[in-house]
């Protein structure tokens, strides 16, 4: 009797450990895991702080939405473990803030290299067409302000 109870507890513990260990792998491989609130595409949510596995932009849904064939590992509001933030690349369309590489079209703030088209602020090198502010070298055509050397045609201010 005692052995049976111990075996069940061990099985439950092992199952939980496997489920928790597989979540970061799915986040890395699939790029979308376990949203913990309803998100509409382009609504401008962020993935910083203590939010658990939220995805930004381009993904709408609510509750526990899992991807990559994994199901039944989350319950309740969809939070799995504390302070587990997503670090997988994705391609949202607009209004996101994150710390992972992506190729957005507009209105993003991040700290990794990318090739956006408009309206971005970042601290890494990029090749941009318009309206950017950054602190690293780039080749830009118009309307930029930065604090590093660059080759620009018009409307730039620099301090080096």
From Swiss-Prot:
Where is this protein chiefly located?
Answer: membrane
| Coiled-coil region | none
Q: Which InterPro entries does the UniProt record give?
A: VlpA-F-like_signal, VlpC_N
Where in or outside the cell it occurs: the entry states:
Cell membrane
Instruction: Give a Gene Ontology cellular component term annotated to this protein.
Output: plasma membrane
Q: Where is the composition biased (Polar residues)?
A: 93-160
Topology class, membrane: Lipid-anchor
**Region of interest (6 X 12 AA tandem repeats), residue spans:** 86-157
In which residue ranges is the amino acid composition biased (Low complexity)? 38-54, 62-87
Annotated sequence repeats reside at 86-97, 98-109, 110-121, 122-133, 134-145, 146-157
Q: Which UniProt keywords apply?
A: Cell membrane, Lipoprotein, Membrane, Palmitate, Repeat, Signal
Region Disordered: start and end of each range? 32-160
Residues with a covalently attached lipid (S-diacylglycerol cysteine): 30
Signal peptide span: 1-29
Lipid modification N-palmitoyl cysteine sits where? 30
Function, please?
Responsible for the antigenic diversity for host adaptation.
What more is known?
The numbers of repeats can vary and is one of the basis of the antigenic diversity.
- State what protein this is by name: Variant surface antigen C
């Amino acid at each position: 009797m005692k052995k049976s109870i111990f075996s069940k507890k061990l099985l439950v513990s092992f199952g939980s450990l496997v489920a928790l260990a597989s979540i970061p792998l799915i986040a890395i491989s699939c790029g979308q895991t376990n949203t913990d609130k309803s998100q509409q595409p382009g609504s401008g949510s962020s993935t910083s702080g203590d939010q658990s596995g939220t995805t930004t932009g381009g993904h709408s849904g609510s509750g526990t939405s899992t991807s990559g064939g994994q199901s039944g590992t989350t319950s309740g509001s969809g939070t799995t473990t504390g302070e587990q933030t997503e670090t997988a690349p994705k391609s949202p369309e607009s209004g996101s803030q994150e710390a992972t590489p992506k190729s957005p079209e507009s209105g993003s703030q991040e700290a990794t290299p990318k090739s956006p088209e408009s309206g971005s602020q970042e601290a890494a090198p990029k090749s941009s067409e318009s309206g950017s502010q950054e602190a690293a070298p780039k080749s830009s055509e118009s309307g930029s302000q930065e604090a590093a050397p660059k080759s620009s045609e018009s409307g730039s201010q620099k301090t080096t």
